[in-house]
Amino acid sequence: LKDGEVVYVGTDETLYGTEQGNYLAKLFKEDGKTEVNIAMFTGTLGLDNVTKRTASAKKALEDNGIKANYVFENTAEWDRGKAMDQFAQFMGSGETVDAVICNNDEMALGVIEAMLTNGDKTVFCPVVGIDATDVGCAAVKEGTMACSVFQDPVAQGEGTLKCALGLLKGEEIEGLVDNYYNITPQLVTKENVDNFIK
Protein backbone atom coordinates (compact mmCIF):
# COMPACT_ATOMS: atom_id res chain seq x y z
CA LEU A 1 0.00 0.00 0.00
CA LYS A 2 1.07 3.51 -0.69
CA ASP A 3 0.89 6.18 1.98
CA GLY A 4 -2.68 7.40 2.41
CA GLU A 5 -4.33 4.32 0.89
CA VAL A 6 -6.83 2.31 2.84
CA VAL A 7 -7.97 -1.31 2.96
CA TYR A 8 -11.66 -2.21 3.12
CA VAL A 9 -12.53 -5.33 5.10
CA GLY A 10 -16.10 -6.50 4.69
CA THR A 11 -18.62 -8.03 2.36
CA ASP A 12 -19.54 -6.81 -1.08
CA GLU A 13 -23.08 -5.62 -0.30
CA THR A 14 -24.37 -6.87 -3.67
CA LEU A 15 -23.75 -10.45 -2.52
CA TYR A 16 -26.45 -10.22 0.17
CA GLY A 17 -29.18 -9.36 -2.30
CA THR A 18 -27.87 -11.91 -4.78
CA GLU A 19 -28.21 -14.66 -2.15
CA GLN A 20 -31.81 -13.58 -1.44
CA GLY A 21 -32.76 -13.42 -5.11
CA ASN A 22 -31.17 -16.76 -5.98
CA TYR A 23 -32.90 -18.44 -3.02
CA LEU A 24 -36.33 -17.10 -4.01
CA ALA A 25 -35.81 -17.90 -7.71
CA LYS A 26 -35.14 -21.52 -6.78
CA LEU A 27 -38.35 -21.65 -4.72
CA PHE A 28 -40.39 -20.06 -7.51
CA LYS A 29 -39.02 -22.47 -10.11
CA GLU A 30 -39.85 -25.43 -7.86
CA ASP A 31 -43.43 -24.09 -7.73
CA GLY A 32 -43.49 -23.58 -11.52
CA LYS A 33 -43.72 -19.77 -11.19
CA THR A 34 -41.98 -17.49 -13.70
CA GLU A 35 -43.89 -14.29 -12.90
CA VAL A 36 -44.35 -13.17 -9.31
CA ASN A 37 -45.48 -10.25 -7.18
CA ILE A 38 -42.86 -8.99 -4.72
CA ALA A 39 -43.00 -6.62 -1.75
CA MET A 40 -39.65 -4.95 -1.02
CA PHE A 41 -38.66 -3.29 2.25
CA THR A 42 -35.49 -1.23 2.12
CA GLY A 43 -33.29 0.41 4.70
CA THR A 44 -32.66 4.15 4.78
CA LEU A 45 -32.80 5.53 1.25
CA GLY A 46 -29.58 6.84 -0.23
CA LEU A 47 -27.26 4.52 1.69
CA ASP A 48 -24.85 2.53 -0.47
CA ASN A 49 -25.67 -0.82 1.16
CA VAL A 50 -29.42 -0.26 0.66
CA THR A 51 -28.98 0.52 -3.02
CA LYS A 52 -26.73 -2.50 -3.58
CA ARG A 53 -28.80 -5.01 -1.58
CA THR A 54 -32.01 -3.95 -3.32
CA ALA A 55 -30.64 -3.83 -6.86
CA SER A 56 -28.78 -7.13 -6.57
CA ALA A 57 -31.83 -9.01 -5.25
CA LYS A 58 -33.83 -7.74 -8.23
CA LYS A 59 -31.03 -8.60 -10.65
CA ALA A 60 -30.69 -12.15 -9.27
CA LEU A 61 -34.40 -12.80 -9.83
CA GLU A 62 -34.17 -11.42 -13.35
CA ASP A 63 -30.98 -13.39 -14.11
CA ASN A 64 -32.81 -16.56 -13.04
CA GLY A 65 -35.64 -15.90 -15.51
CA ILE A 66 -38.17 -14.65 -12.95
CA LYS A 67 -40.34 -11.69 -13.97
CA ALA A 68 -40.93 -9.79 -10.76
CA ASN A 69 -43.66 -7.19 -10.34
CA TYR A 70 -42.78 -4.95 -7.39
CA VAL A 71 -46.28 -4.30 -6.11
CA PHE A 72 -44.93 -2.64 -2.95
CA GLU A 73 -41.53 -1.02 -2.42
CA ASN A 74 -40.79 1.34 0.41
CA THR A 75 -38.27 2.13 3.11
CA ALA A 76 -39.01 1.04 6.65
CA GLU A 77 -35.62 2.48 7.69
CA TRP A 78 -34.37 -0.85 9.13
CA ASP A 79 -37.23 -0.71 11.70
CA ARG A 80 -39.41 -3.67 12.71
CA GLY A 81 -42.37 -1.56 13.84
CA LYS A 82 -42.43 0.52 10.65
CA ALA A 83 -42.28 -2.60 8.48
CA MET A 84 -45.10 -4.19 10.49
CA ASP A 85 -47.33 -1.12 10.13
CA GLN A 86 -46.61 -0.69 6.43
CA PHE A 87 -47.19 -4.34 5.59
CA ALA A 88 -50.42 -4.42 7.62
CA GLN A 89 -51.66 -1.47 5.54
CA PHE A 90 -50.49 -3.16 2.34
CA MET A 91 -52.42 -6.34 3.18
CA GLY A 92 -55.55 -4.22 3.47
CA SER A 93 -55.17 -3.26 -0.20
CA GLY A 94 -56.08 -6.77 -1.35
CA GLU A 95 -52.94 -7.01 -3.52
CA THR A 96 -51.26 -10.43 -3.43
CA VAL A 97 -47.56 -11.14 -3.02
CA ASP A 98 -45.48 -14.24 -3.66
CA ALA A 99 -42.55 -13.13 -1.46
CA VAL A 100 -41.29 -10.28 0.69
CA ILE A 101 -37.65 -9.18 0.39
CA CYS A 102 -36.21 -7.13 3.26
CA ASN A 103 -32.80 -5.42 3.50
CA ASN A 104 -32.44 -6.69 7.09
CA ASP A 105 -33.91 -9.18 9.57
CA GLU A 106 -35.66 -6.55 11.70
CA MET A 107 -37.91 -5.46 8.84
CA ALA A 108 -38.52 -9.11 7.89
CA LEU A 109 -39.62 -9.81 11.47
CA GLY A 110 -42.00 -6.84 11.31
CA VAL A 111 -43.58 -8.21 8.13
CA ILE A 112 -43.94 -11.63 9.77
CA GLU A 113 -45.60 -10.06 12.83
CA ALA A 114 -48.06 -8.26 10.53
CA MET A 115 -48.92 -11.55 8.82
CA LEU A 116 -49.36 -13.38 12.13
CA THR A 117 -51.74 -10.75 13.52
CA ASN A 118 -53.95 -10.34 10.42
CA GLY A 119 -56.30 -12.47 8.37
CA ASP A 120 -55.71 -16.19 8.79
CA LYS A 121 -52.70 -15.48 11.03
CA THR A 122 -50.18 -17.41 8.92
CA VAL A 123 -46.98 -16.51 7.11
CA PHE A 124 -48.50 -16.91 3.65
CA CYS A 125 -45.38 -16.39 1.52
CA PRO A 126 -41.59 -16.52 1.92
CA VAL A 127 -40.10 -13.58 3.83
CA VAL A 128 -36.32 -13.12 3.52
CA GLY A 129 -33.92 -10.96 5.52
CA ILE A 130 -30.24 -10.14 5.96
CA ASP A 131 -27.96 -10.26 9.03
CA ALA A 132 -28.84 -13.64 10.61
CA THR A 133 -29.37 -11.96 13.98
CA ASP A 134 -30.28 -14.15 16.95
CA VAL A 135 -33.99 -13.38 16.54
CA GLY A 136 -33.69 -13.74 12.77
CA CYS A 137 -32.15 -17.20 13.15
CA ALA A 138 -34.86 -18.17 15.64
CA ALA A 139 -37.49 -17.18 13.05
CA VAL A 140 -35.70 -19.22 10.36
CA LYS A 141 -35.58 -22.22 12.73
CA GLU A 142 -39.30 -22.00 13.49
CA GLY A 143 -40.07 -21.60 9.79
CA THR A 144 -41.59 -18.12 9.81
CA MET A 145 -38.61 -16.51 8.03
CA ALA A 146 -37.60 -18.40 4.89
CA CYS A 147 -33.94 -17.37 4.97
CA SER A 148 -31.46 -14.78 6.10
CA VAL A 149 -27.94 -13.97 4.94
CA PHE A 150 -25.18 -14.04 7.55
CA GLN A 151 -22.81 -11.11 8.04
CA ASP A 152 -19.86 -12.63 9.89
CA PRO A 153 -18.57 -10.10 12.44
CA VAL A 154 -15.90 -12.50 13.71
CA ALA A 155 -14.51 -12.99 10.19
CA GLN A 156 -14.59 -9.21 9.69
CA GLY A 157 -12.63 -8.72 12.91
CA GLU A 158 -10.12 -11.42 11.98
CA GLY A 159 -9.75 -9.96 8.48
CA THR A 160 -9.15 -6.49 9.91
CA LEU A 161 -6.47 -7.82 12.27
CA LYS A 162 -4.85 -9.86 9.48
CA CYS A 163 -4.72 -6.80 7.20
CA ALA A 164 -3.44 -4.48 9.94
CA LEU A 165 -0.63 -6.89 10.91
CA GLY A 166 0.28 -7.47 7.27
CA LEU A 167 0.48 -3.74 6.64
CA LEU A 168 2.60 -3.13 9.75
CA LYS A 169 5.02 -5.90 8.77
CA GLY A 170 5.06 -4.85 5.12
CA GLU A 171 3.92 -8.34 4.09
CA GLU A 172 1.68 -9.37 1.23
CA ILE A 173 -1.85 -10.00 2.54
CA GLU A 174 -3.44 -13.19 1.25
CA GLY A 175 -6.98 -12.54 0.04
CA LEU A 176 -6.48 -8.80 -0.49
CA VAL A 177 -7.54 -7.75 -4.00
CA ASP A 178 -7.35 -4.09 -5.04
CA ASN A 179 -7.30 -2.99 -1.36
CA TYR A 180 -10.47 -5.02 -0.73
CA TYR A 181 -10.55 -7.95 1.71
CA ASN A 182 -13.83 -9.71 1.04
CA ILE A 183 -15.82 -11.67 3.63
CA THR A 184 -18.19 -14.09 1.89
CA PRO A 185 -21.80 -13.97 3.15
CA GLN A 186 -23.59 -17.22 3.97
CA LEU A 187 -27.20 -18.14 3.23
CA VAL A 188 -29.03 -19.27 6.37
CA THR A 189 -31.99 -21.63 5.89
CA LYS A 190 -33.89 -24.10 8.05
CA GLU A 191 -31.42 -26.76 6.91
CA ASN A 192 -28.30 -25.07 8.31
CA VAL A 193 -29.60 -22.51 10.83
CA ASP A 194 -28.35 -24.50 13.82
CA ASN A 195 -24.79 -23.66 12.71
CA PHE A 196 -25.55 -19.96 13.24
CA ILE A 197 -27.43 -20.08 16.55
CA LYS A 198 -25.23 -19.07 19.47
Regions found by a protein language model. Give the residues of each.
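A residue-level marker of the well-folded mature domains of exported/periplasmic proteins
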Residues: 1-198
